[in-house]
Amino acid sequence: TETVIPEDIYVLTINPHMHLIGKKYKAYAVEPNGDTIPLIKIDDWNFRWQYFYTFKKILHLPAGSLIKVEATFDNTLNNMDNPFNPPQFITGENGSMKTTDEMLQLIVSYLPYQEGDENLKLE
């Protein structure tokens, strides 16, 4: 999935979010000039890693950048975290947010960009 950033922003934190069927998670930005900026990559998803991750330096994304999220899910018996045996069709119907439902989200904390912000350190 992807979304376009309509204005210059600086990113403070990101929060990847999936449930028990999630296996891999990757988020990155593509600037209007085509440059790719990695945001987060988790090759072995763990449900307990749903934290807000803070960048050491403010990340500037210019207007028109795309934020893209890619994920892999494993709804088989090979997934030791699968809550269902046998596996079932999983949704998040009607806004249900149970751990046994599934979802894919990227929460981004950001503020409008001001020149010089990229020199601030968040550590």
Residues of each region from the PLM?
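His-enriched metal-coordination microenvironments in redox/metal-binding proteins
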Residues: T1-N119, E123
